[in-house]
């Protein structure tokens, strides 16, 4: 059991830390402990920089400047764009040419709207340098239109044939031109803009609607370009990718952001809120544009849509995969806060408990022992000969050592008595207020609500108390999750300190995983099914590899070190999907995903999982 000692105690009079999403969480993974606490937030992402670092390379932006902050804040929309069927097929190079022709025709309407919007914005700017900068941006758009003319020639698009604007294109262009004309909620009507300063706001608002598109295309170009190799010299869309990954386009995107920052620097909080809303709306409309492109070909994404005829069995770890805090820290917090402070308050209690001060010291000792012994166990595993190729049997044997360690650690916890006297209602209340990783509960909710989808959700966890997990998911309206964890034993709703030990090691997890799948096979012996496992630690490694798709969320270094030692490959999910798409054809009969391949797919947010599995709402 990966357990953590709380680093900061809360007020003795309440379980305030457990009940408020705005307080400091006393948790750290034991083998990544730091002096500073983690802050619990309902919007805390798994990674604090733009949640792509283990999968997608984000172009650098200043996190201190407004454009950088907005890009980070609305990165979810960026993910839905890059994981769109259109974008995946384009990156893979097997997008049907007719689809690309239609896209180019629609994009021309976008660019013409950009050029007009820049023209209007330049008229509103009251600074000569700003006017010149906007004029330069307009020139870049005109150059891009010329590039589209070359695309027209390369792909035999009839430029004399009038191409109707689709609804997604129309929504964005109308939004952009309305913004550039000053028709913005919270802004004076165009005819009532009395001063040059007021007109300058319109220029800033226009940049707020343009910037996300520029940054998104710069990001897509860089990401697609990074996937090209020498063997892709004949990639049909290399010219498009080269354009948007070029230094010139990256500089143009940066110039747009810099100008937005300059124009907004003197704005009030309310005016900055308007820019944020415009930025978000532009990102949303871009997502809709990508998903509106008509595709008449099989695609890898979204996963669940393509496997709607199959049974789906989806597994997830809990601690630090679904949660921001480790459940052991929560249980330790409850134990310490509710423990008697002196002999007088201890008298008459149903179950004899340690004093709070003794309990704190005991938790400190258990934490120290766990940290030291865990590191020793991992190093012992890594001291064995490194595998030349994927060695599942060798990994299983090595993890038996870690399993023995985890069981012994649980023995020490039980024998110490630190889990005695916890009230079941306090545990459930803590679970209801437990902050989950941003986007986690949305994925589970969406899966359960999707019609014509035969899916099961299972949580496999080392957590000492399954009631805590069930309460956390129930609070999010996800009652259909099957929880496989350890359980406290209770006497009249008070914990005895004993644990019903069901899942306490990597081997136990793998056994539970296989048992669930075997039962599914026995029930539906003629029907195929797809298994997905989502985890973050060494304890999840066997299940991740056994699953048809193993997704690693913001993994610990121990997971990567141990996995790599036994020949496991860690591939960014988007890169893996593009490779799968290259092999995905009309004739593809079997699933592209198979367990025990030795490959795991890395993501750094649940939003990325959502984009891949479920697609755009």
UniProtKB/Swiss-Prot annotation:
Q: What PANTHER family does its record include? A: BIFUNCTIONAL TH2 PROTEIN (PTHR43198), SI:CH1073-67J19.1-RELATED (PTHR43198:SF2)
Q: Which domain of life is it from?
A: Eukaryota
Query: Which residues bind substrate per the record?
Result: 107, 217, 244
Keywords in UniProt for this one? Cytoplasm, Hydrolase, Mitochondrion, Multifunctional enzyme, Transit peptide
Function noted in UniProt = May be involved in the salvage of thiamine breakdown products. This protein has a haloacid dehalogenase family domain fused to its TenA domain. Phosphatase with the highest activity against thiamine monophosphate (ThMP) and, with a lower activity, against thiamine diphosphate (ThDP), flavin mononucleotide, inorganic pyrophosphate, CTP and dATP. Has a thiamine salvage hydrolase activity, but only against 4-amino-5-aminomethyl-2-methylpyrimidine (amino-HMP) and not against N-formylamino-HMP, desthiothiamine, thiamine, ThMP, and ThDP.
Record: transit peptide:
1-28
What protein is this chain from? Bifunctional TH2 protein, mitochondrial
């Amino acid at each position: 059991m990966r357990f953590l000692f709380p680093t900061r105690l809360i007020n003795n009079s309440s379980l305030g830390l457990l009940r408020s999403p705005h307080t400091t969480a006393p948790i750290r993974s034991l083998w990544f402990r730091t002096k500073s606490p983690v802050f619990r937030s309902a919007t805390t992402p798994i990674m604090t920089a733009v949640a792509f670092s283990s999968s997608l390379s984000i172009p650098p932006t200043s996190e201190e400047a407004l454009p950088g902050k907005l890009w980070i804040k609305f990165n979810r929309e960026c993910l839905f764009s890059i994981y769109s069927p259109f974008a995946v097929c384009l990156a893979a190079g097997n997008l049907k040419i007719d689809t690309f022709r239609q896209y180019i025709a629609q994009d021309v309407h976008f660019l013409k709207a950009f050029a007009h919007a820049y023209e209007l914005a330049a008229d509103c700017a009251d600074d000569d340098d700003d006017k010149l900068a906007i004029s330069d941006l307009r020139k870049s758009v005109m150059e891009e239109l010329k590039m589209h003319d070359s695309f027209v020639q390369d792909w035999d698009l009839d430029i004399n044939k009038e191409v109707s604007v689709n609804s997604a294109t129309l929504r964005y262009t109308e939004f952009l031109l309305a913004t550039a004309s000053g028709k913005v909620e919270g802004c004076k009507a165009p005819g009532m803009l009395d001063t040059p300063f007021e007109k300058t706001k319109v220029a800033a608002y226009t940049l707020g609607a343009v910037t996300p598109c520029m940054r998104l295309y710069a990001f897509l170009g860089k990401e697609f370009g990074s996937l090209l190799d020498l063997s892709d010299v004949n990639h049909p869309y290399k010219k498009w990718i080269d354009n948007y990954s070029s230094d010139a386009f990256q500089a143009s995107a940066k110039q747009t952001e810099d100008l937005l920052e300059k124009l907004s620097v003197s704005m009030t909080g309310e005016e900055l809120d308007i820019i944020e809303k415009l930025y978000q709306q532009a990102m949303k409309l871009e997502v809709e544009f990508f998903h509106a492109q008509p595709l008449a070909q099989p695609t890898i994404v979204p996963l669940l849509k393509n496997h709607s005829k199959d049974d789906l069995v989806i597994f997830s770890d809990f601690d630090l995969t679904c949660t921001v805090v480790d459940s052991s820290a929560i249980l330790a917090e409850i134990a310490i806060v509710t423990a008697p402070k002196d002999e007088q308050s201890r008298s008459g209690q149903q179950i004899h408990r340690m004093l709070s001060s003794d309990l704190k010291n005991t938790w400190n000792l258990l934490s120290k022992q766990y940290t030291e012994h865990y590191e020793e166990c991992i190093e012992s595993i890594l001291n064995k000969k490194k595998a030349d190729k994927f060695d599942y049997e060798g990994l299983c044997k090595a993890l038996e050592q870690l399993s023995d360690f985890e069981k012994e650690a649980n023995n020490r916890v039980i024998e110490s008595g630190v889990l005695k006297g916890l009230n079941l209602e306090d545990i459930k209340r803590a679970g209801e207020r437990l902050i989950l990783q941003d986007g986690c509960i949305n994925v589970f909710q969406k899966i359960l609500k999707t019609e014509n989808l035969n899916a099961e959700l299972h949580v496999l966890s080392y957590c000492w108390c399954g009631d805590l997990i069930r309460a956390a998911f129930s609070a999010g309206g996800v009652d259909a999750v099957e929880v496989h964890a350890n359980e406290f034993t209770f006497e009249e709703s008070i914990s005895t300190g004993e644990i019903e030990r069901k899942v306490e090691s990597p081997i136990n997890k793998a056994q539970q995983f296989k048992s669930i799948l075997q039962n599914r096979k026995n029930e539906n012996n003629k029907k195929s099914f797809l298994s997905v496992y989502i985890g973050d630690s060494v304890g999840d490694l066997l299940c991740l590899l056994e699953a048809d798709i193993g997704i690693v969320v913001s993994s610990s270094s121990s997971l990567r070190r141990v996995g790599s030692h036994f020949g496991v490959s860690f591939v960014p999910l988007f890169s893996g999907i593009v490779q799968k798409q290259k092999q995905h054809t009309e004739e593809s009969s079997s699933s592209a995903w198979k367990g025990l391949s030795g490959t795991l797919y890395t993501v750094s947010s649940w939003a990325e999982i959502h984009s891949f599995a479920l697609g755009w709402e």
